[in-house]
Structure formats: C-alpha cells, structure tokens
C-alpha cells in the first residue's frame, strides 16, 4: 500500500524522509510505503501554500503541516482538507486513548463548527505552573564570572545593573582569566525573538505583567490585557534603555541572527543571555538561572507563557486532503505515530542506528517492558542531534509515559528542576491566555489586527530600548 505526504525537514539534515531510520522501521512494521515531498523547513510555508493551490494534484496529507487556525478553517471551507473526527473514532485507538485521558485536547482540536480538521502534536513535561513551557525566555547569568569577581547572584533590577557594570569594568580581567576570544559582552539577547527576548527582566516594574511573546496577559479577575500599554512595561523599557546607554548591552542584540548569537556564546563571551536552554548557546556548568528580579517598588513576579497550562500543543500539525482515497489506511498509519513507544522517537530521535548519533538506547522499565532510555549526549548539542533523526509530525508524549515508555530528556529534566527551584514561588498570576479556537471571521479579524499591532509594538519596543 502507498500514501503520499508533504513534510518539512531542517536544512542541516537529510531531505529524503525515507532515509530516516524511523520511517524505514515504520515501513517494515506497517507495510505502507510513503511517497514524500519534502521542503526545507525555512521555506516550508511558501512552498506548502503553492502545493495546496494545485487542487487536482494534492497529496494524501501533510505530515508536518504547520497550519494556523486560519489555515485549517480556510482550507476546510475550500474543501482542500477533510474532517477527521469519524476516522479518529473508527481507526485511531492510540489517539482516542489520549483524548480519553485528557478530554481537553479533543476540545482544543475541535473547530467552532464541531469538526476536527487536524491531528495534534502534544508534548507534556510537567503541568500547570510546573509545565516546562511555563517560561521560554530564561535569563542565564555567568556564575563563573560572578564568583571570580566575588559577587552574589542579583535579586533586584538595581543589583543586576551593578553586576553588569562590574562585568563591563572588569572586562580585561575576565578576558585574561578565562582566556576569552573577542570582547566581553555583559548582556546579549535577540530582541522580539521568542525565548531570546529579554522581557522577563522587566516583570518587577509597575503592575508586574512585564511582557509576553504575544503581548497578552490575564489579570486574576479574568480580564485580558495588552502588555505593551501598561505603565510597568513603559518603565521597564526605559530601564532597559538605560542599560544600553551604559554600554552593558551587545550592540548586535537588535539585529543578530541565531547563528551569530550562538557563535559568541560558544566563545564564552556572555555575562547574561536569554534562551530556552543555555546548553544550545554555551554550557550549563558556567551559568545559572537568574531569579525573578524585584523591581524599584518592590514588585516581583514571573508572567507565564500563554497556552502553557496545557503543556506543549500544536493544533494544526497534520492534515488529510480531499484527494486522499484510502482515508482508513491514512488514519490507521497516522495512529501509529501516537503509540506510546513511537511518539517519543518521532519527537526526539531513535535508537540502534549504526554510524549515527542515537538519542536513545532500547532498555526496559521496572516492570520489564520496553522503554526508550536517553543516552548521554556528551558535548553534542541536543538540538543538532535531534534534527538528525527526529521526524516531528503528529504525536503525543504524556506525563504518564516517563519512566514507563521513555526517560525524561536530561536537558529537560535539568531545566524543569532548576525552573521549579528558581521561579515557581514567583509565578503569581492565576491564569494564562489559553489556546482558543475561534470562528474563521474572528480568527481572520484577530490575525489582521494582531499582525499589524504586534509588528508596530515590537518595532517600537526595539526602537525605545535602543534609542530611548
């Protein structure tokens, strides 16, 4: 049997999915051959839209569909993608089991018209305030430099400023002591770039909402606010500008790409930087998480990321098109991705592949059942290793799976443990903005307004921090 899918792959890895060990094994196991069309990840959205415009020539589905809510509703209305709820109930016991355990995911996948148009990606690591997604842009401060200069970890915005000044004034000593190539940079970030943004530093100003990636926050009475018009935001941005005028901020922080940001990190040049996991930029032995800073008027808070209550969730991960003749086969094949031993591999990588860097070894759990055990990656960057083998697509890794079907990734466990210790006590707000599936008109309206307003707000944010 054969099915055809469109997918994407990172530029650094093979562009032929059938060369990947995960798909080779799946073909043996299911006896289904997949005819892939693969686009490089960073060109994917344009190429995908072009492919979907060729109505008579559609594949059976999109495996890594990357569809927004608006895409799902628009393509459903045009008859390009099909409703899936009956297929799920008939042919997909693995996905059904996930929905039974966590009914909220079925609700979140269901469009306002009552249909389900896509298969989701779900990654649980902790839940609620303890979910790993609760904070994205973690500030990591160079503990080695602090110790060398005899300084404590700062706990207020003023103390941080003094520490950054010390990094600036002792740049030559630090350079010599730690044999650093290039100039010492007290603080670096990539403005408006998700986890690399420095907004977490300004949570202590004014009302304490700071800023979030999409600039929405929820008050404890349930009111939704826009962060960039709050008093505290303005005060916080002024303070960040002050740091710029004192030569404490990397001049490239407003223009640099990820690769430049990482290259400087690998040369150990940062006193403070922001990202999901410091190991992707430098190493986690020299740095510690900088705790929530108390602002000038004594406020201290950590605003959680929106949507993080339900852990990692991507609604529009995988779709089937109206050209799909054998929908039962397609659904049954996709359901294999939701098998508890399969999902972690699709998400992170595989085991037992010769001449390749494996993420796992196949081991056993305490009851003697098969379990994927994370290998020690040594000096390898987790992201690079994952990109070589993982396939992403629709999957579900649930909290119950850890130590039963898969061990927690070491980097995630390290991040979770440190996050809980450093930030949990300061996550004051009750709510985060949830993952709402609105009607096509509302989605369209929101995306129009939001695109323009977000663009303008972020332009101004960068401009004000840089130029005042």
Region annotations inferred by a language model:
Residues 79-109, 164-168, 178-217, 264, ...:
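Carboxylate/His-rich catalytic cores and anion/metal-binding grooves
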Residues 9-18, 125-140, 147-153, 190-246, ...:
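Extracytoplasmic/periplasmic substrate-binding proteins
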């Amino acid at each position: 049997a054969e099915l055809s899918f469109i997918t994407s792959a990172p530029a650094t890895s093979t562009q032929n999915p059938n060369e990947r060990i995960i798909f080779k094994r799946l073909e043996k196991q299911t006896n289904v051959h997949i005819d892939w069309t693969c686009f490089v990840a960073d060109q994917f959205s344009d190429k995908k839209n072009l492919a979907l415009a060729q109505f008579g020539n559609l594949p059976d589905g999109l495996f890594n569909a990357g569809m927004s809510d608006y895409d799902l509703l628009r393509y459903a209305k045009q008859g390009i993608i099909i409703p899936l709820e009956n297929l799920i109930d008939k042919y997909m016991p693995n996905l059904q089991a996930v929905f039974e355990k966590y009914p909220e995911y079925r609700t979140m996948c269901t469009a306002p018209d009552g249909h389900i148009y896509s298969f989701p990606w779900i990654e649980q690591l902790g839940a609620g305030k303890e979910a790993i997604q609760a904070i994205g842009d973690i500030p990591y401060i160079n503990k080695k430099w602090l110790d060398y200069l005899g300084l404590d970890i700062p706990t207020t915005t003023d103390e941080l400023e003094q520490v950054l000044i010390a990094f600036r004034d002792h740049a030559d000593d630090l350079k010599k002591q730690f044999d650093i190539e290039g100039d010492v940079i007290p603080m670096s970030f990539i403005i408006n770039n998700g986890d690399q943004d420095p907004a977490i530093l300004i949570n202590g100003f004014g009302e304490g909402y700071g800023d979030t990636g999409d600039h929405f926050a929820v008050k404890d009475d349930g009111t939704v606010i826009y962060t960039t018009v709050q008093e505290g935001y303005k005060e916080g941005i002024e303070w960040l500008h002050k740091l710029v005028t004192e030569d404490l901020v990397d001049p490239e922080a407003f223009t640099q790409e990820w690769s430049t940001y990482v290259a400087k990190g690998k040369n150990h040049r940062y006193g403070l930087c922001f990202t999901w996991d410091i190991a992707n930029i430098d190493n986690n032995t020299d740095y510690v998480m900088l705790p929530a800073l108390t602002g000038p008027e004594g406020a201290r808070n950590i605003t959680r990321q929106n949507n993080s209550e339900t852990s990692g969730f991507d609604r529009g991960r995988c779709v089937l098109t109206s050209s799909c003749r054998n929908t039962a086969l397609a659904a049954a094949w996709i359901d294999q991705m939701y098998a508890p031993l399969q999902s972690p591999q699709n998400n992170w990588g595989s085991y037992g592949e010769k001449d390749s860097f494996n993420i796992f070894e196949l081991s056993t759990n305490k009851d003697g059942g098969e379990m994927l055990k994370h290998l020690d990656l040594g000096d390898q960057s987790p992201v690079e290793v994952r990109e070589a083998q993982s396939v992403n697509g629709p999957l579900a890794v649930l909290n119950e799976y850890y130590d039963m079907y898969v061990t927690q990734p070491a980097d995630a466990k390290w991040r979770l443990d440190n996050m809980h210790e450093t930030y949990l006590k300061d996550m004051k707000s009750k709510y985060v903005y949830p993952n709402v599936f609105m009607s096509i008109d509302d989605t369209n309206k929101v995306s129009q307004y939001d695109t323009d307003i977000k663009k303008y707000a972020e332009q101004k944010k960068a401009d004000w921090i840089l130029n005042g």
